[in-house]
Amino acid sequence: MRNRQLTLSFPSTLYLSPVLELLLADVPAQLVPLVRLGLQEALVNAAKHGNNLDPAKAVRVHYRGGADWWCWVIEDQGAGCPECTCLHQGPEDSWESGRGLYILHQVFDQVEWCQQRQRLQLTKRLAEVDSCP
């Protein structure tokens, strides 16, 4: 498969099924449930925590993908994410909504947050499968 790009913008909502279907179109079937979980967490965070579910505020997703890698950049119009300084804490930590950030780190190979632009970049690579002789 050659590299593909897609940009989506949608009003803040928790109805994400159509958006997720478009964003997962190039992901291999065996990875779809896991990546869907991660993308759903990220999109819910952007719409709910970033944009306060304000339908006048948009969530924008830039997608790039190749044969064995996928990258999603999610932007919201909110004020930022103060708890994002603690991205590596686990779900047992006491701060609210930290579970979603923990899930992102379990699902994606790379998670980068840009506070100044309210932008989250998620990268997933297809793990090489060792073949038996």
Residue ranges and their predicted role:
Residues 1-5, 47-133:
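Conserved beta-strand-loop-beta-strand hairpin that lines the nucleotide-binding pocket
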Residues 30-55:
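Conserved ATP-binding N-box helix of the HATPase_c
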Residues 1-37:
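Bergerat-fold GHKL ATPase/HATPase_c domain
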Residues 27, 31-35, 39, 67-69, ...:
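Hydrophobic alpha-helical segments and their boundary regions
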